[in-house]
Amino acid sequence: AVRDREKRRKGAEVMAKRHYIPVTADVPGAASEGNCALIRKVIRTALAAEGVDVPCEVDVLLTNDSGIHEINREMRQVDASTDVLSFPEFDLRPGELPAPEDADPGTGLVPLGDMVISMEHVAAQAREYGHAKRRELSYLVVHSVLHLLGYDHLDEGPQKARMRAREEAILGELGIGR
C-alpha cells in the first residue's frame, strides 16, 4: 500500500502542472501575485500528496468577513462568518480519488470544487496563533483541499485526527511549520 501511494504521488507530481486553479478576489489586493502563486503551489502540493493523478480544477475566491458571511448564510444557512468554506463537487471519502471519467468533457479537467477564504480571518488568526499570514493562508488552503477530497473533522476523534495529521504532513512537505 505504501509503494502504491508513493507511485501515485510521483505520477500526481507530473500531473500537478496540468491543474487549473483560478484565483479571484472581491477585496482589493487579496489576489496579489504572491498570494495567487502560494495558493496554487499549496493546492498542487496537497493534491500530489493525496495521490490525485488526474488534472483537476479548483476555484478559489478570496473575500472578507462580510463576503464569506453572506456565502455561508446563502449556501449553508449558517448566519456567521468563518475562515474558509469548501464546496466539493463530489462526495468522496478520505483516500478515495477522483476518477478520470469525472472529467468535464469540454476541458478534460475534474472539477473538484470551490473554496472561499476570508482574508480578514487569515490576518486575525495569524495574529492569534503567532505565526505569519503566509502560514495561515497555506493551512486554510490545505484544510479546504482535504475537505474537497472527502476529509472531515466533525467528530473530535479519529476523523479529526486523520485530517489534522494530513494537514501537518502536507504543510511539512511545503516547509511550512508552526
Task: Name each model-derived stretch.
Residues V2-S138, L146-R178:
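An acidic/histidine-cluster motif and surrounding catalytic segment
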